[in-house]
Amino acid sequence: MKIIYVTNQDPNSQCDYQEVSMLHGLREVLGDDCIDYPRKKIMYGDFSESPKKELHGWGFSLLTEPIQDVKNRQLCEVDFVIYGVTDAYGVKNLPEVDKLAERGVWYLDGHDHSKITKTPCFKRELFEPHENVFPTGFGIPEHRIMPIDFSNKVQIIQKTAPPYATFGPQILGPTARQLYVFNNEQDYYDDMNRSWFGLTCMKGGWDSLRHYEILASGSCLLFRDYDRKPKLCAPQDLPCFFYNSAQDLRDLLSRLVVDNKPTQEYIDMVYAQREWLLTCGTTKVRAIKLIEVLNEQVS
């Protein structure tokens, strides 16, 4: 299968997590048969037009290691054209590219809202079944996954726990940069790795790269209001402990770790979450699922 992956070129919005994570996975799976067009410079470690410190999340996790470039960017014998951000950031269809798709034009919808803007598409904030719309979500590169280690825990929750997860205000958009605690990505991961729990919650949408980073760090993810998330919406079928109140959270913290030692219930959940991450939540498996759907729907 050969794909042209149409990218967003707005220099002020280069690190769209859905676009970047899927491109990472597709390149890993398809290699030279996934051509980013135009070439997505930040994926290759080129931040000359979009400085890393100005990117969403400072490029942590998804831009740690440059992806390998393709050897041939000739746009021919193409099966699919996929728009990496659908119609966000002013992206419009390119008729001269669309006509190259022998098997169809698809869209990757990373909008935080549940509205369907173009089909056929893959959508992370999918609230109910819709014709020609298929669930997807963020992913994290396999190289970012740390070993599980229960012996190095020194704190209950991570320093970067969002205020809303502890029943404070929901802080979104550029204002959320005030919540960035670490300048160094490894320090960010080490903090989660040394925490018994990683608290998370809904942001602009239900899916958040934070979920995957907590899982990758080897901390036990606790998800505020996960039981209220629509089933088809990412992260789908994630094993986790959820809580709806401050008392729920206190009860979980005291029940799962006793005298600074993990209970069997805690241990079992951490390993279940790691299995989910490896089978459902990496950039590679997200890309594999996308390719499977394309082949099933267009035979």
Positions of predicted regions on the chain:
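Catalytic cores of extracellular degradative/oxidative enzymes
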Residues: 202, 249, 271-274
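Residues at or immediately preceding the N-termini of alpha-helices
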Residues: 185, 246-249, 263, 283
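Short amphipathic alpha-helices within nucleic acid-binding modules
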Residues: 252
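Nucleotide-sugar donor-binding catalytic core of glycosyltransferases
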Residues: 2-239, 279-289
